[in-house]
Amino acid sequence: SESDVDVCVMLRDTFHTDYAQGKGREDYGFKASDFTFQEYRNLVKKALQDKFRTEYVYDGNKSLKIDENTYHVKADVVPSFQLRNYYYENSLDPNKYIEGVWLQAKTGEIVKNYPKRHKANGIAKNNNTNYQYKKLVRIMKHIKNEMVEDKKTDGDKITSFLVECLVYHVPNNVITGYSTWTETVKQAIIYLYNEIKDGHHTEWCEVSDMLYLFRNRKWTDEDAEQWLVTAWNYLGYGE
């Protein structure tokens, strides 16, 4: 987000699950809970209002927003349930799972992600590119933000998260192979455009490697391809 601070408040006592194939709650000794996500979100909101005063705390779609004042900075607080993924490693052990987060947006959209794996994979790629990967991510996000401000792209579809995931799929030798950022950005756009155009992107995942990037998302591969073309022209590479 564009806030100064992002905080996830995850509840572990109540959790959602992706079970191993053919398995269910009873196989792991779990019981259903009647504690809803909306009840939890309301409790977190009340706690924030008690701490920061009601007029500074309000609902966003996925997060609770805290406005800045002279005593604290602007923040996004994301209430979530723990997500336990047993499916990925076909685990039948209740204590062996990949941890993610599960939340329900105000629109009703169910959101799952895996921030710990996202972070670990991002660090690994950054290390393997001599710390150039995260720099390229920042540059590409900045370009995207400027394009949104100039009304050259749709920020609701071309999100910062999508941009980061696209850059994650740029090969390390492309990220490290050029002496200027101008050329690196140019070659990254060329690579991504060609891969999507040729259909080599269908198995791409998020940075976490847990969820497909172009399946059942609010963006499509056509959106990403069009953004790359628009960015190419926006940066003057086509001149």
Question: PLM features: what roles do these ranges have?
Answer:
Residues 1-37, 41, 77:
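Catalytic metal-binding acidic patch
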